[in-house]
Regions:
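A conserved short coil-to-beta-strand element within the FAD-binding core of flavoproteins
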Residues: 146-147, 152, 172, 196-211
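Conserved beta-strand-loop-beta-strand element in the redox core of flavoprotein oxidoreductases
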Residues: 201-243
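N-terminal Rossmann-like FAD-binding beta1-loop-alpha1 element of flavoenzymes
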Residues: 3-30
Length: 416
């Protein structure tokens, strides 16, 4: 008899986890308090699919003192194991993303190629010093001259200073929400169920597994049973708390996970603003906008091509878990204009903000929670959605008792 697994949260992490579990033969039910998949943090996040490059990101992003202290303490504990395992997971994840696209026929408006801008000689020298270490981790990174970068991205502003660039093999961009929507359908074909507008109130061990208490919490304008809806959407459920037993559960619900875990996790909120606009198509100017992914660490900015649209993301800010941040969308517009001037239709801009969980050391929280039957798939953000597919695959393998494709022991919550 196959085991029953509850997945809490239907963001990209939850959907990929549900698919991988269903593909291994588990009976999967996904609980999501919103009305669809990838509605919250996954909706407005960066479109990048980036390998993990330790040491490249600037650790001086705005953050409260408490978080900086926790990051310092966690960094002393983490060691090289976590870094090497994350690099291996990064490689696996990008390969798994490509594999799912090909095997399942997913079309998430993907584009291949990722360049990281090095605006001056100082940043170029710093990156060059890290290059050997990255390659020792098995990461395929190449330092290219500015002229080569401009050949690969002909839409770059000729007047924007550029010393060199890092070219990341297997990196690229894609529409994370579109990927999640299509993978959800594949998970449903394997028997996974999705219950939207359903809030999980508590998870408790009862000796025979986990008892999950959930409640149907529809919005006031929720459709009736007779209303037209997409295939597979949740029908209205009985009102009031409902108890349901599962063999195991996976928390993919970000900042809400500690409440269900019943323990304190050193999580902060990472905020990221994004602007999405249609690519400007002008006869005689075929190279407006990026061909794929472009990152400017000095401006905390990423620009990514997704089909006929461009997504600009940045303004990463870390706060306490419940704090809010006013996004600076104008900074994103200025950054886009700096690198790819005149490339989008500003009259049709969509603005958004992602708010996701971030661990004390900035690394994912993956694996067994320490409570029997309860697993974690949290804190995957920061540099796009490059870790998502591999994390889900490895976690499903561990739950199934299989040998994981890569070791993630150092990425478990026990390190914190």
């Amino acid at each position: 008899m196959s085991r029953s697994i509850a997945v809490v949260g239907a963001g990209l992490a939850g959907v990929t986890t549900a698919y991988e579990l269903a593909a291994l033969g588990f009976q999967v039910q996904v609980f999501e308090r919103g009305g669809s998949v990838a509605e919250q943090a996954s909706f407005a996040s960066s479109a990048l699919l980036s390998p993990f490059l330790p040491g490249l990101a600037d650790a001086s992003a705005p953050a409260p003192l408490g978080f900086r202290l926790r990051r310092w303490r966690a960094g002393r504990k983490g060691g090289d194991d976590a870094v090497s395992q994350l690099a291996a997971l990064s490689r696996l994840s990008l390969a798994r993303t490509t594999e799912l696209r090909h095997e399942l026929g997913l079309d998430d408006e993907a584009s291949d190629g990722l360049l990281i801008a090095l605006a001056d000689a100082k940043r170029t020298a710093a990156a060059e010093a890290l290059l050997e270490g990255w390659q020792a981790l098995g990461l395929q990174v190449e330092l290219i001259e500015a002229g080569e970068a401009r050949l690969r991205e002909p839409g770059l502003n000729a007047d924007a200073p550029l010393s060199a660039a890092l070219a990341l093999a297997h990196g690229g961009a894609g529409n994370a929400r579109l990927f999640a929507q299509q993978l959800r359908l594949q998970a449903q074909r394997l028997g996974a169920g999705f219950r939207f507008h359903t809030t999980v109130r508590a998870i408790a061990a009862d000796g025979a597994g986990l008892m999950l208490r959930h409640e149907y919490t529809p919005p006031a304008e929720a459709p009736t049973r007779s209303a037209e809806r997409e295939a597979g959407d949740t029908l209205p459920q009985p009102l009031g708390p409902q108890d349901e037993r599962f063999d195991a559960a996976v928390l993919c619900n970000g900042l809400d996970a500690p409440t269900l875990l019943g323990e304190r996790l050193p999580l902060s909120a990472q905020h990221e603003a994004s602007v999405t606009a249609p690519l400007r198509l002008v006869e005689g100017y075929p190279d407006l906008g990026p061909k794929a992914g472009w990152v400017d660490p000095s401006r905390d900015l990423s620009v990514a091509r997704a089909g006929q649209r461009v997504r600009v993301s940045g303004g990463l800010t870390v706060t306490d878990a419940r704090a809010r941040v006013n996004p600076d969308y104008e900074a994103l517009h200025r950054g886009l204009q700096h690198w790819f001037p005149g490339s989008v239709l500003h009259q049709q801009v969509q603005q958004g903000q992602a708010r996701r969980a971030m661990s004390a050391d900035g690394l994912p929280l993956l694996g067994a929670s320490g409570r029997p039957g309860l697993w974690l798939n949290l804190s995957l953000g920061g540099q796009g959605w490059g870790l998502t597919c591999g994390s889900a695959q490895v976690l499903a393998q561990l739950i199934a008792g299989q040998a994981p494709a890569v070791d993630i022991a150092a990425l478990g919550p026990q390190r914190l």
